[in-house]
């Protein structure tokens, strides 16, 4: 992937890596996948080498892809903090900045250049927290089209031991936190306890390791699970979620997956699945290629949904017209029906 930096209209820059196919594989509606990494990682997380890069999958599918270095990491300017709001969390600051400033700037810079139809967010861990805030805050008036959300490395219940360890680090921290690489590899990759990662990946983990702003560790470990439904409840785009079987930071079980799936009642489609034989960092594991291929397929599906939805203007159903019922009448029975100009009937809430 190619490194980039672009100026932001509010001042400062956003940086990352990009991979744009020279020609699409077929004349279809394309997503622009925007990858948002988790804590202690920058854009290189999604572009470690030719075997562990999203570009090896997205280029094959003809999908333009951007991996961000989040605000406060590397050369990306920190998100501005509103000193008048004492209750806003680190994740909310980042999510608001991405939604209002960064994603519109990326779309203005790269949207027409790539021929993309809409953005699909692909996010991991703390990045998934932030992208959920983005999608839950999105109104459609920000200056970019958003068609889908992919999250991984996040759930509804933190693993107790690692959470306590993170809180201990925060108590001792006087600035950014630098993880020690051996215990980090054990939690993120299950090395050496499990054979879930190519051994060569351990040669990369040290230079992938970035200092972590303490605010994001505090948010994900103490606050997030208390307010995340405020955002997930409002998300109206398709959602795909993957939680690793051997995630070292989050509890994984069928119950957890169902809880996560149920947290997006306004989404037209939600999938939440266990990624078998994978550690917290799926993208750095032996399941990396399979996961990236799933993400690309889902992104294509989201954009097709986005286009068809925008082309189908809702219209009212006249009582006694012979259709399956009026919107008003069916709503009273717990069914919401929209009939589109194509005569397709969509039913939800059954």
Where are these regions (language model features)?
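Conserved alpha/beta-hydrolase
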Residues: 55-77
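Alpha/beta-hydrolase active-site loop
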Residues: 86-110
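Alpha/beta-hydrolase
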Residues: 160-253
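Conserved loop-alpha-helix segment in the C-terminal half of the alpha/beta-hydrolase fold
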Residues: 245-272, 278
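Short, surface-exposed "cap/lid" segments of acyl-processing enzymes
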Residues: 25-57
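Conserved hydrolase catalytic core segment
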Residues: 125-151, 157
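Catalytic histidine-centered segment of alpha/beta-hydrolase-like enzymes
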Residues: 278-287
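N-terminal cap/lid segment of alpha/beta-hydrolase-fold proteins
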Residues: 1-24
């Amino acid at each position: 992937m190619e490194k980039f930096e672009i100026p932001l209209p509010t001042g400062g820059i956003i940086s990352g890596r990009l991979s744009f196919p020279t020609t699409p594989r077929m004349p279809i509606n394309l997503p622009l996948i925007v990858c948002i990494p988790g804590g202690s990682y920058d854009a290189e997380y999604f572009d470690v080498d030719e075997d562990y890069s999203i570009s090896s999958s997205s280029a094959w599918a003809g999908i333009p892809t951007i991996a961000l270095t989040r605000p406060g990491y590397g050369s990306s300017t920190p998100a501005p903090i509103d000193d008048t709001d004492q209750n806003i969390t680190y994740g909310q600051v980042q999510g608001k900045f991405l939604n209002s400033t960064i994603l519109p700037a990326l779309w203005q810079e790269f949207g027409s250049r790539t021929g993309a139809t809409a953005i699909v967010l692909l996010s991991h861990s703390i990045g998934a927290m932030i992208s959920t805030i983005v999608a839950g805050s999105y109104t459609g008036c920000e200056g970019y089209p958003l068609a889908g959300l992919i999250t991984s490395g996040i759930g509804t219940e933190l693993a107790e031991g690692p959470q306590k360890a993170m809180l201990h680090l925060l108590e001792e921290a006087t600035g950014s936190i630098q993880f020690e690489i051996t215990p980090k590899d054990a939690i993120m990759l299950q090395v050496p306890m499990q054979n879930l990662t190519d051994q060569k990946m351990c040669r990369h983990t040290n230079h992938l390791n970035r200092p972590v702003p303490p605010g994001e560790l505090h948010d994900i470990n103490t606050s997030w699970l208390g307010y995340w439904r405020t955002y997930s409840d409002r998300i109206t785009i398709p959602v795909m979620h993957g939680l690793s079987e051997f995630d070292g930071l989050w509890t994984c079980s069928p119950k957890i997956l169902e809880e996560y799936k149920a947290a997006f009642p306004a989404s037209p489609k939600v999938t939440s699945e266990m990624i078998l034989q994978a550690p917290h960092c799926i993208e750095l594991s032996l399941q990396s290629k399979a996961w990236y291929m799933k993400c690309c397929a889902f992104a294509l599906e989201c954009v097709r949904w986005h286009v068809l939805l925008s082309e189908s203007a809702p219209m009212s159903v006249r009582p006694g017209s012979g259709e399956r019922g009026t919107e008003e009448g069916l709503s009273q029975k717990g069914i919401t029906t929209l009939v589109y100009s194509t005569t397709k009937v969509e039913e939800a809430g059954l």
